[in-house]
């Protein structure tokens, strides 16, 4: 039987990535051109800068992916691309490249939801058992998603305000940490103690919605008041206290979701899934009867490998798009 190859493109934010998947599960290449250094001085992603960088490197990413995979364009069976959610300018660069490549090589185009990509990155670990529940945590999203079968997604809980990754970056900026701050806060938290009191919004309420704006504001106020009074704060304890509050909220809502939606598998994915503290709490707090599946670190951040793994599901369903496909920066799971 002929091998099947899918080329995938991801450009929803500040990573330009092209990957090649063989036979639905083997990643032969996952080229990632990061822009982190370009955005550090701004303390966050600047959309116009991100779009320009995508334009500069996307062609090279295509070439490098094919070379690393050891195949040529004529070996491919489909092209997949992230069409939302994300920054509209950034999405359009990747989509233009993917559509042009698909047209030139007479290949079908597979539209992929960026968050479905994060979720399906777990397929790199093992074949997933359905139905399952997913906790998706990133810089732009915090969602609990019920997946009844491959490709069938339903959001059952989400943040009312800030995404968890966004909260990490904002408090990191207040402390003078380098963007993105999540990894450094996690490392500092492991050296400190939970000594400062921060709120755990809606942690006892029965619904599955999150809120991190109150926690962020409490952190900023504590830091500001200490500065005004000339009081010293222990950075490690500050990070430990902030992270403890975040993880208490995430774990409480996830456990409630598991009671409301009994499943045997929990996927935890997205950039924040790389957080060591979160991984430790999942190991201790989630019932051993639940199979917790977390993508490897290399697939937690934005990358085209996860888009390819999600695209394999859509390929089986023959969910192809025309070359008129447009970017949907606010795309939700329900509209997939």
UniProtKB/Swiss-Prot annotation:
Binds 1 Fe(2+) ion per subunit. It is found in: Cytoplasm. One of its GO terms (molecular function) is N(6)-L-threonylcarbamoyladenine synthase activity. Fe cation binds at residues 114, 118, 302. One of its GO terms (cellular component) is cytoplasm. Keywords: Acyltransferase, Cytoplasm, Iron, Metal-binding, Transferase, tRNA processing. It is an enzyme of class 2 (transferase). InterPro entries: ATPase_NBD, Gcp-like_dom, KAE1/TsaD, TsaD. One of its GO terms (biological process) is tRNA threonylcarbamoyladenosine modification. The keyword Zinc-finger does not apply. Its EC number is 2.3.1.234. It catalyses: L-threonylcarbamoyladenylate + adenosine(37) in tRNA = N(6)-L-threonylcarbamoyladenosine(37) in tRNA + AMP + H(+). Pfam families: TsaD. Its main location: cytoplasm. HAMAP family: TsaD (MF_01445). Required for the formation of a threonylcarbamoyl group on adenosine at position 37 (t(6)A37) in tRNAs that read codons beginning with adenine. Is involved in the transfer of the threonylcarbamoyl moiety of threonylcarbamoyl-AMP (TC-AMP) to the N6 group of A37, together with TsaE and TsaB. TsaD likely plays a direct catalytic role in this reaction. This is tRNA N6-adenosine threonylcarbamoyltransferase. It comes from Streptococcus agalactiae serotype Ia (strain ATCC 27591 / A909 / CDC SS700). The lineage of its organism: Bacteria, Bacillati, Bacillota, Bacilli, Lactobacillales.
């Amino acid at each position: 039987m002929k091998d099947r190859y899918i080329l995938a493109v991801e450009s929803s934010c500040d990573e330009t990535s092209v990957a090649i998947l063989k036979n639905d599960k083997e990643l032969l290449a996952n080229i990632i051109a990061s822009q982190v250094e370009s955005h550090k001085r701004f303390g966050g992603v600047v959309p116009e800068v991100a779009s320009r960088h995508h334009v500069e490197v996307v062609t090279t990413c295509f070439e490098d992916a094919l070379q690393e995979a050891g195949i040529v364009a004529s070996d491919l069976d489909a092209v997949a691309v992230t069409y939302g959610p994300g920054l509209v300018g950034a999405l359009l660069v990747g989509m233009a490249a993917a559509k042009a490549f698909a047209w030139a090589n007479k290949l079908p185009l597979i539209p992929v939801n960026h968050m479905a990509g994060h979720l399906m990155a777990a397929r790199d670990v093992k074949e997933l058992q359905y139905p399952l529940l997913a906790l998706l945590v990133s810089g732009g999203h915090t969602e609990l998603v019920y997946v009844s079968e491959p490709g069938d997604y339903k959001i059952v809980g989400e943040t009312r305000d800030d995404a968890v990754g966004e909260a990490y970056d904002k408090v990191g900026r207040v402390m003078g940490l380098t963007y993105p701050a999540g990894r450094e806060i996690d490392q500092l938290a492991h050296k400190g103690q939970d000594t400062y009191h921060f709120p755990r919004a809606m942690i006892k309420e029965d619904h599955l919605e999150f809120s991190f704006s109150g926690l962020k504001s409490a952190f900023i106020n504590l830091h500001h008041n200490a500065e005004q009074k000339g009081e010293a704060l222990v950075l490690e304890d500050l990070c430990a206290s902030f992270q403890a509050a975040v993880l208490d909220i995430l774990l409480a809502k996830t456990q409630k979701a598991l009671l409301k939606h009994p499943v045997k598998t929990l996927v935890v994915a997205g950039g924040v899934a790389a957080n060591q503290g979160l991984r430790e709490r999942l190991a201790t707090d989630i019932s051993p009867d639940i199979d917790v599946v977390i993508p490897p670190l290399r697939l937690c951040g934005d990358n085209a490998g996860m888009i390819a793994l999600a695209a394999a599901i859509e390929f089986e369903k023959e969910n192809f798009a025309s070359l008129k496909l447009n970017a949907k920066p606010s795309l939700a799971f329900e509209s997939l």
